[in-house]
Amino acid sequence: MTNIRKSHPLMKIVNNAFIDLPAPSNISSWWNFGSLLGICLILQILTGLFLAMHYTSDTMTAFSSVTHICRDVNYGWIIRYMHANGASMFFICLFMHVGRGLYYGSYTFLETWNIGVILLFVTMATAFMGYVLPWGQMSFWGATVITNLLSAIPYIGTNLVEWIWGGFSVDKATLTRFFAFHFILPFIIAALAMVHLLFLHETGSNNPTGISSDADKIPFHPYYTIKDILGAILLILVLTLLVLFAPDLLGDPDNYTPANPLNTPPHIKPEWYFLFAYAILRSIPNKLGGVLALILSILILILMPMLHTSKQRSMMFRPISQCLFWVLVADLLTLTWIGGQPVEHPYIIIGQLASIMYFLLILVLMPVAGSIENNLLKW
């Protein structure tokens, strides 16, 4: 009799994806972030579901309902902070996952990479809409500023913004539709993640060397299941420490003030994980130019396979590219810092230089470094 996990139609899929999957024997801890993202998504869907049971998407009661969750619902405060800080952990894992893909050349798996970029976009949209729901000052003004960017689109811009708002300003209709979208999108993310995995399992995983590992595979279980469990324990430990000891560390104090359309906060800024893109947006004086730069800052990832000039897939044996990669990381950290600063000297010029550096590194310097390294191989 054959084993049930190899014969049952559903178990067979699970078996081929998580148990008998042939995996490279040398993948490092940088390959843990895929499973961690899955755990983050499940955690966000569960905590979000329990929050939605008590939340009301009406401008008059939204802020009060969040206060009610934190004060009156059994363990409501922990559910709320798990959800808010879970989003931060989600984005930390996302950035590490994308960074790993860039460093080790995983973007040569075209379908997997492109679906990954779509996943990044959808996740960012979901997080943005979720940030609007508590209806604090930063929720309201963040929604106003970001949706208003669409008015930069020629001819149809203003109509588009009013269509998204459901009126002439961010109001009840906006909040209700954002809640509806924020509820449905995580399930779309889950579906896309399955397609992402489907395409990945067509080719098999990449590995740190960037060389085919067909000659040296090991089963996913028990080797990588135990490794993923260790990663999950560390993720939950960090999240628990954050939730229990510093729940508001990554939040904005302005969001503890109910939304007031008549009073603009001194510094409007998004959550920390959007600050790098926000800094790029602000560094261009022209509205439409800023919006295009903002979109391109993420969309540029789709160009990565076309910008790959090296004969080697991974950066493991490419010291010049390695240096440029870490300069890019430093540049993104600089942009994140600038995004949270007021628009004044010297922050404006630092932001502009960091934005130019970001596009220059990806579009020019890294492809040139790849070509130089190819020539150095001939020596």
From Swiss-Prot:
> Which residues does a ubiquinone bind?
201
Required cofactor names? heme b
**Note on how the cofactor is bound:** Binds 2 heme b groups non-covalently.
Subcellular location per UniProt equals: Mitochondrion inner membrane
- Could you state one GO biological process linked to this protein? mitochondrial electron transport, ubiquinol to cytochrome c
Q: Name one Pfam family in it.
A: Cytochrom_B_C
Q: Where does heme b b562 bind?
A: 83, 182
Q: Which domain of life is it from?
A: Eukaryota
Instruction: Name the positions where heme b b566 binds.
Output: 97, 196
How is this protein situated with respect to the membrane? Multi-pass membrane protein
Q: Which Gene3D superfamilies match?
A: Cytochrome Bc1 Complex, Chain C
Q: Which PROSITE patterns match?
A: CYTB_CTER (PS51003), CYTB_NTER (PS51002)
Q: Keyword set for this entry?
A: Electron transport, Heme, Iron, Membrane, Metal-binding, Mitochondrion, Mitochondrion inner membrane, Respiratory chain, Transmembrane, Transmembrane helix, Transport, Ubiquinone
Kindly indicate whether the keyword Cell membrane belongs to this entry: no
GO cellular component terms, A-Z: mitochondrial inner membrane; respiratory chain complex III
Q: Any stretches that span the bilayer, and where are they?
A: 33-53, 77-98, 113-133, 178-198, 226-246, 288-308, 320-340, 347-367
Which SUPFAM superfamilies would you find in this protein's record? a domain/subunit of cytochrome bc1 complex (Ubiquinol-cytochrome c reductase), Transmembrane di-heme cytochromes
Keyword Acetylation attributed: no
Protein family (similarity comment): Belongs to the cytochrome b family.
Among PANTHER family, the record links this protein to:
CYTOCHROME B (PTHR19271:SF16)
Further details from the record: Heme 1 (or BL or b562) is low-potential and absorbs at about 562 nm, and heme 2 (or BH or b566) is high-potential and absorbs at about 566 nm.
User: What does this gene product do?
Assistant: Component of the ubiquinol-cytochrome c reductase complex (complex III or cytochrome b-c1 complex) that is part of the mitochondrial respiratory chain. The b-c1 complex mediates electron transfer from ubiquinol to cytochrome c. Contributes to the generation of a proton gradient across the mitochondrial membrane that is then used for ATP synthesis.
Note the subunit structure: The cytochrome bc1 complex contains 11 subunits: 3 respiratory subunits (MT-CYB, CYC1 and UQCRFS1), 2 core proteins (UQCRC1 and UQCRC2) and 6 low-molecular weight proteins (UQCRH/QCR6, UQCRB/QCR7, UQCRQ/QCR8, UQCR10/QCR9, UQCR11/QCR10 and a cleavage product of UQCRFS1). This cytochrome bc1 complex then forms a dimer.
Annotated protein name in UniProt: Cytochrome b
Q: Which organism is it from?
A: Neotragus moschatus (Suni)
Q: Mind giving the lineage of the organism this protein is from?
A: Eukaryota, Metazoa, Chordata, Craniata, Vertebrata
The gene name reads: MT-CYB
